[in-house]
Amino acid sequence: MSEKIVQLNEEIIKGQLKELVRGSVEETLNELLEKEAESLTQAARYERSEARQGYRSGHYDRNLTTTSGDVTLHVPRLKGMSFETAIIERYRRRESSVEEALIEMYLAGVSVRRVEDITEALWGSKVSPATISELNKKAYVHIEDWRNRPLQGGRYPYVYVDGIYLRRNWCGEYENVAVLVAIAVNEDGFREVLGAAEGMKEDKASWVSFFQWLRGRGLDGVKLIVGDKCMGMLEAVCEVFPDAKYQRCTVHFYRNVFSVVPKSKVKIVVKMLKAIHAQESKKASREKAKAVVAELRAMKLKEAAKKVEDGIEETLTYCDFPSEHWTRIRTNNVIERLNREIRRRTRVVGTFPDGNSALMLVCARLRHVADTQWGNKKYMNMKHLEAALDDASIAG
């Protein structure tokens, strides 16, 4: 009698084992998150205790890439205290840096040897350069999913926007096209990249489309939008977020004034302008601005005086918000630093073959910086804003 031979499908077994490990990792990490929350609050969920510190306020989901695969973390929300977990810091998402490397290889035209070396470092085995195109398609899908993800950070009181120009091929001709970028500080005080999208130029139509896209994905609770006074942006803010206030970036405002000031007088004008925004109230800043305008006219800098006189009010909106936040909401330096990092990477490419490749590289960099540099570092203490929301000047 012949014995039956059982054939095992190695790929199926590997897949099942991988899913078993992934599920175990996911379950363990979520249990650790709950333990961390219990330790911080000094009480279990639903437990009544005199020693309790803070209160539970549900959960929010966050995807995390581990060596065992993608897992979904159910991160506890706490009221009355911040929850800064070491779990996410330790197992921070690695996907973005991998995708960025793939896209850079594809766009920068790296050598075959470098492609082999990098792919071996990333996946443990050398990948033929012939497969790079397929790998990039996969990376594009992941980044596009991230770019269009629902915004789940609750409310976003402070939003920073800017445009970065990249050179790309457009119907056989090369021209500069704007990539519009937005980041925000959420209600818990953490920075978050909201998104990036290509706009033919920084005009009202592009900004309206961009803001509507963000709002459609869940951007809510906006109190202040910080940015440069580029064409059409202020009108777009009023149309899409009528209850939000607009803060013109003071750094961009200064540069605009410097454009009509002789180089020999820039240093003294810098001190004059900074003195306006060093005041302790909007009223004092307005009075200082009037004095600066008069002084500029006395220095025969009539154009500079007019720019200050016409534009100063838009730069003082930050005074309507908690003074503890002033230094971080009167400029969009937080997004400018991101843009410098993006330019450093895109400079290697030079001219992009199309808008999609440019946008994907920008998004990959944004995601990488947010994941690796921002992490769980709180950017602002939002209790100051919560305490001020009863003020009609902020509530709008």
Regions found by a protein language model. Give the residues of each.
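Acidic/histidine-rich catalytic cores and adjacent linkers
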Residues: 2-4, 24, 35-38, 42-43, ...
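DNA-recognition alpha helix
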Residues: 113-124
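RNase H-like nuclease fold core
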Residues: 74-79, 86-92, 125-126, 131-226, ...
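Short, conserved DNA-binding cores of transcription-related domains
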Residues: 2-89, 167
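Conserved beta-strand -> loop -> alpha-helix junction used to position metal-binding or nucleic-acid-contacting
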Residues: 224-231, 236-272
